[in-house]
């Protein structure tokens, strides 16, 4: 199915309004066809016969026709805008919904700004094309068909002469249409590049200022801006060439009409009024053809944008639920990794033959040098990625056999990079459990040592924290994230450097809260600072994607291996 047909499918739910809009459009277009026919009667009947009554009748009729035309124009404009906007809303929501359920791998391979451009620039390009082009197409086609019908009624030979130019127009539109689609695609790509640079620089403004790289970033933006300018001008060049070519072909046709029509009037085969009306219709015929060429160009722009939009909707996610996936019921937290291997691509093995048995309620610390696979191993547990070999079990249930939602509901995560949303402190904590009460939210904040600093703020829990929590300190952001995880009350916890952003006093209080939270829950803790995991039930030491040591703190020190070396290095 081509992209144009796919776009039409989005309009199907609104087909009733669409048909009504087309009806009003056709009636409004008929009003344009009325004037030349009346002009014929004015010349051939009113002026020739000096018929005052007919003149008055025509005058009143013109007013009535244009009054009706105005009502129809309003109705068709409103209805087409409604349908167009609804179609755009549906497409934008479909793209956003698809993005929400794509795997992490999709986002890691693309710039954030490029992904944003799909929802903003590309869907926005469809918006103008769908609303304007659909309305204009029906209007111009109505005028085109109506004009041809009336022209054949006036003089069929002249009408056939008019149609000779049609194949030339169609060929020109086809040739230029292909160029427009190509240049429009490049134009959308350049717009996406600008969005990507803009998103990256705004989100990294503190780094830019700290390195005094404002001029460097301006130069980057100017480069992309001019690349976009060149793409826009290339597209404009093609559009600017198309219209004069169509006009030239139409002008040649009209010239033949005047020449041949004049002979017919001189020979008495056609009245002067009929020739004037015919020429007006022929001119009207040229205008729709010219406008249709412009509409065709806009449609090609829309198809270039649609191609990018549908590329998102057609994207296959790496993480797929089985058709018969079941709900993961309440768990106690036993976790088993059995011969698990993972790699991002064929040549890059990240985890190799991981075997790990964790009892319910145990605290498992994961340590090792950078790049050892510590974060990757815990990312497999909520199925952010799937292993290429082996299986992972929770309470002896293969996590690949259960629904993603029921699996992830059982797991709480405090990531290394704190992510908060623009809104209030209360809403950010509530994100952990949207059904929680105010008392439960406050209890979670107290457990994370966040309640006191929240109450010191002017708006307390309703304090707006800004984008990504920019109005809070690093330690405050971390504690809000921990409170959010506490509120979720999961059976399995993943703590990735969970207290690394806190000051000494807050770290102690939060660590105490986490220690209490982890009681009775299975916890995976990634920590570079070994002082935070000395009491772990099990410490696994990773190197180059493999578990090289495993045991308690005391057991690993006795081995005098990698862990012992890391411990001595930190506590020297």
Per-segment meaning from a language model:
Residues 1-32, 39, 47-59, 68, ...:
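Membrane-integrated ABC transporters
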Residues 2, 11, 43, 80-81, ...:
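Juxtamembrane loop-to-helix connectors within ABC transporter transmembrane domains
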Residues 26-37, 66-74, 126-129, 133-145, ...:
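Hydrophobic alpha-helical transmembrane bundles that constitute the permease/transmembrane domains
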Residues 49, 85, 93-125, 196-220, ...:
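Short intracellular "coupling" helices and adjacent cytoplasmic loop segments at the cytosolic face
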Residues 321-322, 328-572:
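ABC-type nucleotide-binding domain
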């Amino acid at each position: 199915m081509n992209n144009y047909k796919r776009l039409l499918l989005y309009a199907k739910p609104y087909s009733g309004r669409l048909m009504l809009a087309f009806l009003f459009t056709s009636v409004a277009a008929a009003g344009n066809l009325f004037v030349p026919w009346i002009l014929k009667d004015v010349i051939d009947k009113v002026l020739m016969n000096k018929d005052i009554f007919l003149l008055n009748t025509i005058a009143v009729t013109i007013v009535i026709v244009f009054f009706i035309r105005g009502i129809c124009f309003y109705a068709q404009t409103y209805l087409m805008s409604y349908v167009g906007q609804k179609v755009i809303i549906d497409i934008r929501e479909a793209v956003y919904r698809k993005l929400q359920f794509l795997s992490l791998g999709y986002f890691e391979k693309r710039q954030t700004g490029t992904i944003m451009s799909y929802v903003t620039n590309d869907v926005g390009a469809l918006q103008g094309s769908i609303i304007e082009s659909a309305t204009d197409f029906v209007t111009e086609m109505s005028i085109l068909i109506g004009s041809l019908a009336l022209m054949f009624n006036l003089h069929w030979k002249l009408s056939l002469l008019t149609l000779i130019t049609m194949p030339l127009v169609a060929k020109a539109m086809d040739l230029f249409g292909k160029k427009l689609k190509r240049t429009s695609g490049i134009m959308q790509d350049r717009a996406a590049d600008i969005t990507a640079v803009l998103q990256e620089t705004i989100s990294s403004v503190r780094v830019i200022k700290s390195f005094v790289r404002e001029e460097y970033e301006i130069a980057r933006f100017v480069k992309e801006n001019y690349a976009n300018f060149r793409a826009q001008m290339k597209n404009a060049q093609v559009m600017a060439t198309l219209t004069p070519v169509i006009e030239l072909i139409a002008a040649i046709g009209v010239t033949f009409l005047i020449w041949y029509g004049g002979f017919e009037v001189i020979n008495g085969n056609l009245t002067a009024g009929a020739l004037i009306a015919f020429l007006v219709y022929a001119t009207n015929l040229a205008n729709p053809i010219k406008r249709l060429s412009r509409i065709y160009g806009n449609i090609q722009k829309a198809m270039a944008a649609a191609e990018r939009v549908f590329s998102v909707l057609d994207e296959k996610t790496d993480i797929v639920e089985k058709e018969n996936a079941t709900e993961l019921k309440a768990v106690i937290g036993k976790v088993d990794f059995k011969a698990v291997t993972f790699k991002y691509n064929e040549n890059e093995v990240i985890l190799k033959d991981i075997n790990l048995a964790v009892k319910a309620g145990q605290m498992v610390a994961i340590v090792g040098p950078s790049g050892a696979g510590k974060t990757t191993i815990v990312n497999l547990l909520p199925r952010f990625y799937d292993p290429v070999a082996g299986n992972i079990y929770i309470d002896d249930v293969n996590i690949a056999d259960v629904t993603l939602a029921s699996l992830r509901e059982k797991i709480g995560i405090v990531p290394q990079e704190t992510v908060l949303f623009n809104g209030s402190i209360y809403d950010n904590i509530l994100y952990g459990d949207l059904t929680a009460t105010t008392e439960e939210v406050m209890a979670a904040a107290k457990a994370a040592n966040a309640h006191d600093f929240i109450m010191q703020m002017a708006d307390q829990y309703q304090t707006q924290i800004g984008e990504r929590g920019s109005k809070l300190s690093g330690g405050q952001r971390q504690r809000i994230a921990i409170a959010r995880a506490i509120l979720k009350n999961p059976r399995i916890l993943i703590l990735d450097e969970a207290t690394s952003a806190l000051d000494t006093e807050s770290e102690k209080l939060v660590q105490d809260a986490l220690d209490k939270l982890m009681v009775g829950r299975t916890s995976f803790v990634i920590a570079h600072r070994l002082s935070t995991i000395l009491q772990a039930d099990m410490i696994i030491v990773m190197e180059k994607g493999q578990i090289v040591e495993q045991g308690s703190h005391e057991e690993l020190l006795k081995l005098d291996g990698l862990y012992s070396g890391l411990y001595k290095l930190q506590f020297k």
